[in-house]
């Protein structure tokens, strides 16, 4: 481990999280890469998994494996109780009013597509406007592009400040009487910017518009209440918040969901079927056709329990501190470009940067050789990259198990990359 620390490290304080205890809960963090300790800084792509969640998956298949909602035998009843129990766990976690407002999907992408298909095709008319930010992940852009083309609607993009925050002055002008939908990220996966969702939602609702929030980056890191945000839809994924892959959540207001037609058709989403027509099930099951991802949904509940035990305020406190420290260390590199808000309290634990004359992919490979996992590329945000006038960035992203020491290890590797590439001189 590096032994030379900056003055910022000497004065930095860790949050109340017991990071070493937390790290012991994550088996993969004990792995070495080519003899080097794994430093996992790609949490915006997916988080690592605690042993309690992994054990929950194993226990399900060893003790409870059965289909849900359809059997009267003990295994099916127990599996159904666990599955629906997770729905209630999710409801409490995001402050929803009723568990029937929680729809399980395959991920954030499917959740947003569900709204675009089921709500959008019913409600968006020619001449309507769909308002987005320039920071949107392709998953919260491409579905609206397709819908706008089909319905002859128009996409409108909010402005950003030089610091990568939403320009609220022009937002009040761009969200207007033609706005039918505001689809906005809770937190940028490139800039780390935390969006003022409630303020934007109020502007949209004054115009009679509906508000959808892409919470893929926000929900795992911020205390989230759909009531406080005052939105109509929230989409997020469990794999970014300690859960397994293949599980997403769509929350929507009950009255809006009730008015929407199903997204997919088949078993379990019906109440009765005749030869000529069918009657659809009630919420939430009318949006959950077929056998669901039972085991992973149940294990997702265990992941939420883990976060609840830590406390989301404490999770946020830790990320602010480690992000502030990372920003201060990265600034030591002469010529480095760091994207997004300078104030760590206005951003999440996502830090994108570029070093002069070093391609992000080359940098990512050099860091990988040092056992450090980051992301390099456009991060599924090509329009934003065009606005930033770059092809891509390097991105380090932090979570509950990352430490100041790992930031120092990142810095040591970046300095080594500087030497290897012969480009950047440190101050």
Would you name each region that the model predicts?
Residues 3-427:
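Pyridoxal 5′-phosphate
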């Amino acid at each position: 481990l590096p032994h030379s620390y900056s003055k910022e490290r000497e004065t930095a304080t860790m949050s109340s999280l017991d990071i070493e205890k937390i790290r012991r809960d994550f088996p993969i963090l004990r792995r070495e890469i080519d003899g080097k300790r794994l430093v996992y800084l790609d949490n915006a792509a997916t988080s690592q998994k605690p042993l309690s969640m992994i054990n929950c998956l194993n226990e399900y298949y060893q003790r409870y494996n059965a289909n849900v909602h359809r059997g009267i035998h003990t295994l099916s009843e127990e599996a159904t109780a666990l599955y629906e129990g997770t729905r209630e766990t999710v409801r409490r976690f995001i402050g929803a009013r009723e568990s029937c407002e929680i729809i399980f999907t395959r991920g954030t992408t499917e959740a947003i597509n569900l709204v675009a298909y089921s709500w959008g095709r019913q409600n968006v008319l020619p001449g309507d406007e769909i308002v987005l930010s320039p920071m949107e992940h392709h998953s919260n852009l491409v579905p609206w592009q397709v819908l706008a083309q089909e319905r002859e609607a128009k996409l409108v993009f909010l402005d950003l400040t030089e610091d990568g925050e939403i320009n609220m002055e022009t937002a009040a002008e761009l969200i207007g009487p033609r706005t039918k939908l505001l689809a906005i990220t809770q937190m940028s996966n490139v800039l780390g910017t935390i969006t003022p969702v409630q303020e934007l939602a109020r502007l949209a609702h004054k115009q009679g518009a509906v508000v959808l929030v892409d919470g893929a980056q926000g929900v795992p890191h911020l205390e989230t209440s759909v009531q406080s945000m005052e939105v109509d839809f929230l989409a997020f994924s469990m794999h970014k918040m300690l859960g397994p892959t293949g599980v997403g959540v769509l929350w929507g207001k009950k009255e809006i969901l009730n008015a929407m037609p199903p997204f997919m058709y088949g078993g379990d989403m019906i109440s009765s079927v005749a030869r000529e027509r069918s009657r659809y099930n009630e919420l939430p099951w009318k949006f959950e056709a077929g056998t669901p991802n039972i085991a992973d949904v149940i294990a997702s509940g265990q992941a939420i329990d883990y976060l609840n035990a830590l406390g989301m305020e404490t999770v946020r406190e830790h990320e602010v501190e480690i992000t502030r420290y990372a920003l201060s260390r990265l600034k030591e590199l002469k010529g480095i470009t760091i994207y997004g808000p300078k104030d760590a309290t206005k951003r999440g634990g996502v830090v994108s940067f570029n070093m002069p004359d070093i391609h992000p992919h080359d940098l990512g490979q050099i860091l990988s050789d040092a056992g450090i996992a980051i992301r390099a590329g456009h991060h599924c945000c090509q329009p934003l990259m065009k606005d930033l006038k770059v092809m891509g960035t390097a991105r380090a992203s932090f979570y509950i198990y990352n430490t100041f020491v790992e930031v120092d290890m990142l810095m040591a590797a970046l300095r080594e990359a500087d030497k290897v590439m012969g480009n950047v001189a440190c101050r």
